Amino acid sequence: MTKWFNVGKIVNTHGVKGEIRVISRTDFPEERYKVGNTLYIWDEKGTDYLTVKVTSHRQHKTFDLLTLEGYNNVDEVEKLKGSLIKVPEEQLGELAEGEYYYHEIIGCNVVTEEGEALGTIKEILSPGANDVWVIKRPKGQDLLIPYIDDVVLQVNIENKLVTIHVMEGLL
């Protein structure tokens, strides 16, 4: 059975020539949405998908704008709004050491270098220079941890465990 990974969500159309506006859920939009790449657009129920090829990609504000082969006007892409864009596991490329896919990080437990459990990574934000990991704590508000070398000391994907250094003001 194929394992699928969410790489974006179609939130709207853009213009009249069939562009779709995508909120990306991938660290590598320039690779993922490269012209000629195959993507799979899943219906909102998650039961069926369309196979499409990317014919153009550009970034606009915080969105990725795509056009797809065979979809040439706004009426043809209107029905895709709300759909998820997914790729099968075999389309995931190898990463360099110290790089991780979102699905590998989300769900990891986070502990301090002293061994104190802080919570579980529930989301990854990409606001600018570096990613920010959102940690759901057992009690209280979520904790935001910057993904920088000074803070994230060790990531153990096999054991789903991240060890961090608590800098002053972080907690």
From Swiss-Prot:
Main location class: cytoplasm
GO molecular function annotations of the record: ribosome binding
Pfam families noted in UniProt: PRC (PF05239), RimM (PF01782)
Keywords: Chaperone, Cytoplasm, Ribosome biogenesis, rRNA processing
PRC barrel domain segment(s): 96-170
GO (cellular component) term, any one: cytoplasm
Keyword Acyltransferase applies: no
Residue stretches in coiled coil: none
Keyword flag ATP-binding: no
Compartment annotation: Cytoplasm
GO terms for biological process, alphabetical: ribosomal small subunit biogenesis; rRNA processing
Assembly mode: Binds ribosomal protein uS19.
Entry note about domains: The PRC barrel domain binds ribosomal protein uS19.
Similarity-based family: Belongs to the RimM family.
Function: An accessory protein needed during the final step in the assembly of 30S ribosomal subunit, possibly for assembly of the head region. Essential for efficient processing of 16S rRNA. May be needed both before and after RbfA during the maturation of 16S rRNA. It has affinity for free ribosomal 30S subunits but not for 70S ribosomes.
The protein's name in its UniProt record: Ribosome maturation factor RimM
Organism field: Bacillus mycoides (strain KBAB4) (Bacillus weihenstephanensis)
Organism ancestry: Bacteria, Bacillati, Bacillota, Bacilli, Bacillales
Gene that encodes the chain: rimM
